[in-house]
Amino acid sequence: MTLQCTKSAGPWKMVVWDEDGFQGRRHEFTAECPSVLELGFETVRSLKVLSGAWVGFEHAGFQGQQYILERGEYPSWDAWGGNTAYPAERLTSFRPAACANHRDSRLTIFEQENFLGKKGELSDDYPSLQAMGWEGNEVGSFHVHSGAWVCSQFPGYRGFQYVLECDHHSGDYKHFREWGSHAPTFQVQSIRRIQQ
């Protein structure tokens, strides 16, 4: 049985600054922003998420490294990217994370691309897929039945982050390029539900 995604009603709200420590120019968002450059910002260096979950991107047009931004304060780039192997010191586009419903999240992971090979059903957070019995350090494809998830390259939610949502690609991520991997790898070793 496939659960249908119900978009979060929002409202989403985030305040950003162009300098560290909540200093400099400020702007409030309640909807996606494909480029802060259009607002006269060169970059975003600090932010506060007041409601909803957001996805921040290194480059304009929702490109580059992805960072999940949940409710809280991010006084500098290391607060959102300090746990990654190759942190981006700036964010230039944002969008709300749709379908983030922590209680009802469900995801199927597949060993190979195009939903082939061994599979596993997830409905909880896994700081280490290997500890739950997943062989190897790669996932070939995903089907998001419900909710929104963030996958990380390494155990303990470290390394590159990839956001998976049930309303993007119809919840189907057949290949690493569809979930925004920056390296030609299927390496995913930890997965968690996105907090709303």
UniProtKB/Swiss-Prot annotation:
Q: Which residues cross the membrane?
A: none
- The superkingdom listed in its UniProt entry is Eukaryota
Q: Which GO terms describe its molecular function?
A: identical protein binding; structural constituent of eye lens
Any Pfam family matching the protein: Crystall
InterPro entries, from UniProt?
Answer: Beta/Gamma-Crystallin, Beta/gamma_crystallin, G_crystallin-like
Q: Where is this region: Connecting peptide?
A: 99-104
| KW Ligase (keyword) present | no
For this protein, the record's PROSITE patterns field holds: CRYSTALLIN_BETA_GAMMA
Q: Which SUPFAM superfamilies match?
A: gamma-Crystallin-like
Q: Is Metal-binding tagged as a keyword?
A: no
The N-acetylthreonine modification is found at T2
Region annotation N-terminal arm: where it falls in the sequence: 2-11
- Biological processes, Gene Ontology terms: camera-type eye development; lens development in camera-type eye; visual perception
Instruction: Specify the Beta/gamma crystallin 'Greek key' domain's residue ranges.
Output: 12-51, 52-98, 105-146, 147-195
Show the SMART domains listed in the entry: XTALbg (SM00247)
List the keywords (alphabetical): Acetylation, Cataract, Disease variant, Eye lens protein, Repeat
Assembly and interactions? Homo/heterodimer, or complexes of higher-order. The structure of beta-crystallin oligomers seems to be stabilized through interactions between the N-terminal arms.
Family assignment?
Belongs to the beta/gamma-crystallin family.
Q: Which disease is it linked to?
A: Cataract 23, multiple types: An opacification of the crystalline lens of the eye that frequently results in visual impairment or blindness. Opacities vary in morphology, are often confined to a portion of the lens, and may be static or progressive. In general, the more posteriorly located and dense an opacity, the greater the impact on visual function. CTRCT23 is a zonular cataract. Zonular or lamellar cataracts are opacities, broad or narrow, usually consisting of powdery white dots affecting only certain layers or zones between the cortex and nucleus of an otherwise clear lens.
General function of this protein: Crystallins are the dominant structural components of the vertebrate eye lens.
Query: What's noted about domains in the record?
Result: Has a two-domain beta-structure, folded into four very similar Greek key motifs.
**Entry protein name:** Beta-crystallin A4
What is the protein's species of origin? Homo sapiens (Human)
Encoding gene (name): CRYBA4
